[in-house]
Amino acid sequence: MDKLKHTLFGLEFKNPVWTASGTFSYGLEVAKIYDLSLLGAIVVKGLSLKPRKGNMPERIVETPAGMLNSIGLQNPGVDYFINETLPKLKKYDTKIFANVFGEDEDEYLAVAERLDKADGVHGLELNVSCPNVKKGGIAFGTDPEVLYNLVYKMKKITKKPLLVKLSPNVSNILDTADACVSAGADGLVLINTLLGVAIDVEREKPILSTITGGLSGPAMLPIAVRMIWQVYQKYGSRIPIIGVGGISNYKDALQHILAGASAIQVGTANFYDPLSPLKIIEDLKNHLDKKGYVHYSQLIGKAHQMIIKEV
C-alpha cells in the first residue's frame, strides 16, 4: 500500500505535498530541475482576467525568519495561461489547481468561468485577500458576508473543486471559515500571508513601494498551525483543510497534518531550496515507516486526540 496516496475532492493524489501559489510560478521553470509528476499537486500563480504588471519596486524584503512581498499579483492573464502555459503543464502527471483573484465579484466569476472549461485544470483556489474595489478596498476575505456571497456564486459557476485560501488578517478565523463552509466550499486553504511593514532606518521610510506586504516563511508556522487547529477543532473531517505557512521540512508539514490538514503546500521554501517539496515527500515516507503507520491519514488531526487521551 502506498502510504501517501489518497483521495480528496473526488481526485486521486500521489501524495499530500503541493506547491503553494506564487513562489512556484507556473511550474515550468522548476520543471527544468525535477519531474513535476512527483508532486501531489501544483497551485499556479494567481490569475486575473487581464494581464497585470504588478507593483513597482521594491517588492520583496527579507525579514527575520521570512520575507515580506508585495508583488502585486503580476500575471499574464487567464487566457494566456489557458492557451500557452496549461498545454505544457498538463503533460505532467500531477493535479493542477488554478489560483483565482479579482478586483470585484464580476472578475472572479469571469476567471472561474474560463477555468471551469479548461481541460487540465483539476480545481480552483480562491484568493480572497484582494481588496474589493466596490467595497472601499476592504479585502474579500475579511468580511464574512461578502465572502459568503462570493463563494456561493463561484460554486454556481464551476463544477470543479473550489478551495478558499483564507486570510489570517482577521480577528476570528472561524467567522470566515464558517462563511465558506456555509456557501459550499469544497475545502479551505489555511493560511495566506500576514500583513507587515519593514522600514529602512537609514532612509527613514518603508522599504516596500506599497508600504505593507505579506509575511511568509518560517515565522508563519505557529500562526498557520493555530488557525488549522481552530478550524479542525470545529469541523473535523467534514471540511478538508490544506495547510500552508512556514513549511520548510517534513517536521513542519507534520505539525500542519497533526493539527488537522489533509494536505500541505510548500511556499517560500521553494525560493531557497527548490527541492524542498521532494525532500518533504521522502522524509514523510521515512517517518511513517519509522513510526509504523500504515497511511499518513492516521496522523490527520491526531494531536487533538492525544489531548483527549491525556486528560
UniProtKB/Swiss-Prot annotation:
One of its GO terms (cellular component) is cytoplasm. SUPFAM superfamilies: FMN-linked oxidoreductases. Substrate binds at K45, N69, S70, I71, G72, L73, N127, N192, T193. The keyword Zinc does not apply. Binds 1 FMN per subunit. Keywords: Cytoplasm, Flavoprotein, FMN, Oxidoreductase, Pyrimidine biosynthesis. It is an enzyme of class 1 (oxidoreductase). GO terms for molecular function: dihydroorotate dehydrogenase (fumarate) activity. Pathway: Pyrimidine metabolism; UMP biosynthesis via de novo pathway. Belongs to the dihydroorotate dehydrogenase family. Type 1 subfamily. Homodimer. This is Putative dihydroorotate dehydrogenase A (fumarate). The lineage of its organism: Bacteria, Pseudomonadati, Aquificota, Aquificia, Aquificales. The gene is pyrD.
